[in-house]
Amino acid sequence: MQRYAVGIEFSGIQYRGWQTQQPGVASVQETIELVLSKIADEPITLHGAGRTDAGVHATNMVAHFDTNAIRPERGWIMGANSQLPKDISIQWIKQMDEEFHARFKATARRYRYVVYNAPHRPALLHKQVTHIYQKLDVQKMIKAASKFEGTHNFETFRAAACQSNQPVRHVKHCRLFEHGRYLVLDIQADGFLHHMVRNIMGCLLEIGQGMYEIDHIDAMFAAEDRKAAGITAPPDGLYFIQCYYPEQFDLPQPPLGPHWLNLPE
């Protein structure tokens, strides 16, 4: 039995998220499993580094699978990409030892959320960014983003249906910056709660629109109640861009996405 790690890029527009759903509901995981199972000529189960909601994208989702099939790495990639839908692509594959696990060996995960701030919606970026037409106080939003760094109880910033046993997370960095008409939130943490990034972005957007002051974030944390925070930002602008592992696994580190933004590393 061989174990392989894979790096996957996908658009989440047509899928109900990463994780396999009930029959008849398209998921990224199930779509890839069906193709890999054909190539391996045996059932394949894919284990992802994380879960993404419906409509959320990824530029380097890490996953792993076990198989008895013997194929060259190029054969796996070319075979899979020739059969996968055009909105899913295997970017790399590497044979691993059985100690590796895409989810449980991950030490951190990283997301970017992209807002297009302009009067008119961008037709060619439909569902790839979140469009905000109102004028935003970007400098205020930049300062507010840093309030989420460090170790906090994120009860207020997780979905009511979140199944995690505990809401404390350590955020290594939470930075918002301008890139032309785009606003990009870059956030890395040891783990994320359901809707955590989208709720943080929703809070920042409301601050940018002058709905409350930066210090109100402290009161939100203290409340430990989802109702104390504002909107959940749409899934459209959210990208899973990286997953981090101990150096011993030596996984490929592709450029951070989304690639069409041409952002600095």
UniProtKB/Swiss-Prot annotation:
- The cysteines joined by S-S bonds are none
- Could you tell me the Gene Ontology terms of the biological process aspect for this record? tRNA pseudouridine synthesis
Spell out the InterPro entries in the cross-references: PsdUridine_synth_cat_dom_sf, PsdUridine_synth_TruA, PsdUridine_synth_TruA_a/b_dom, PsdUridine_synth_TruA_C, TruA/RsuA/RluB/E/F_N
One Gene Ontology molecular-function label:
tRNA pseudouridine(38-40) synthase activity
* Active site (catalytic residues): D53
Q: Which UniProt keywords apply?
A: Isomerase, tRNA processing
Query: Where along this sequence does the record place binding of substrate?
Result: Y111
Name the catalysed reactions.
Answer: uridine(38/39/40) in tRNA = pseudouridine(38/39/40) in tRNA
Q: What is its EC number?
A: 5.4.99.12
Q: Which domain of life is it from?
A: Bacteria
Which PANTHER family does the entry link to?
PSEUDOURIDYLATE SYNTHASE, TRNA PSEUDOURIDINE SYNTHASE-LIKE 1
**What family classification does the UniProt entry report for this protein?**
Belongs to the tRNA pseudouridine synthase TruA family.
Q: What does this protein do?
A: Formation of pseudouridine at positions 38, 39 and 40 in the anticodon stem and loop of transfer RNAs.
Q: How does it assemble?
A: Homodimer.
Q: What is this protein called?
A: tRNA pseudouridine synthase A
The gene designation is truA
